[in-house]
Amino acid sequence: KNFSKEACREVVRLLGNAGYVSVADDVNMENYEEVETFYQAYVKAHDAEVTIFQVHSDGLLGVLTFIHREGSLQTYYVGVDWKEGGMPYIKNTLVSDIAKITYTPKGYLIYTYKEDIVHSDANQYLRVKPQSDACRELTRKYVSGIRFADYDAFVTSWDSSTVEDILEPCLFEDLYRIHTGESIRTESGWIPAEEYERIMMLYLPVTKEQIRRKCGYDAQRGSYPYEMIFAEPYAPFGEVVDFTENADGTITLTVDGVCIDKEMDCAFTNELVVQPFADGTFRYLSNQSNFFTSNRSFKI
């Protein structure tokens, strides 16, 4: 209970200082070189193993060991929970055979189990190589709240002169979450025009007239229909890998699209320009997408 992000980072750091490989979501892996050493041994068909401590946001600890022996690759997982008073106990264990494992140029360890695990994606992954604090923070602020499937805005090129082309009703759901920090709730299935247009015009260089043309405005109701996003499985996600602070106060973000399902740590690259405002909000001004694969099946 009350396990903060700061506490999570501190546990990862303490485990790292003690010599263990440790990681958490949005936290760089400590002693990541041991994972690279393991993979190099695996590629050379040498026996090897490495243990990784995964600190979860709820305070649980996952201990994941990769073992390569005589051509066979397995993981042995131990889940550790806590009793009252802080006493640890083993909550569950699991041994799984791995069908294949890949280490990408940017440092993603991607692996696939021979048998499907319930509530698990087809491919699993760990971010091994560290990211800079600046790029990680820019990812959190400008990229983590958007999608690279389900709508076209961040998998196509546009600017202020063509922004109307990317307007879709389902865009509002993510922009609302970015703005409020909460998921949208509507009992009637309609969103008041004032709120809808205010948020859309804040985060995109669009006019009220453009929004009304493209997003289903109902003049009689003075509202827009709520269009729920049904998330695409195995969708790519973005990470900022470089950035430029421009003289006009805007920031140009270089955003790589990571597609774990296709074992690609850079399926496409975006040059995304954002304009930060003094109150902490911002606006997406333009996007330039460059794809490095002809297979864009993750794009609706």
List each model region and its residues.
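Mature, Sec-exported extracytoplasmic domains of Gram-positive
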Residues: K1-I300
